[in-house]
Amino acid sequence: MTGYFNNDEATHEAIDSDGWFYTGDIGHLDDEGYLFITDRKKNILVTSAGKNVAPAPMENAMVNSPYIEQSVVIGDNRNFISALIVPSFEAIEKFLSDQGRPTSDNVLMIEDSDVISLIQKEVDSIMEQFSHYERVKEFALINRLFTIDNGELTPTLK
């Protein structure tokens, strides 16, 4: 690539002096030399302590829990990493029903101390695979899904 037409500034931002193209991707090489793209540089959070944290791996790990439907990790310019978590209300409803406390009210579910403890155990277990500074320290449970219509998601679901 030779650069942007009649735009030297944009060319210098995108291509270094050796001809390497800055894609904005973050990745790593494994032991066999394979490249894994793991995130986008613009998606990185920088904590108030200056630690760079990629939120996507944590968000993806959390939604693998049967009790977590959606998660958003926050922490840019903050002392620690937090998360907004939408529980899997179907799984939570079953969890409470199995305890003899059936409810289908999302607000009651997210305020229930046993549900909060259950999600805390899930988050703690999931966070063990991450560095100490990357781990979600606090979370808030949200009583509805993040949607485009509510303005919480973009059309590309970000």
Regions found by a protein language model. Give the residues of each.
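Conserved loop-to-beta-strand segment in the C-terminal subdomain of adenylate-forming
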Residues: 76-101, 129-143
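Conserved ATP-binding/catalytic segment of the ANL
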Residues: 1-47
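Flexible loop/turn segments at secondary-structure boundaries
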Residues: 2, 29, 36, 44, ...
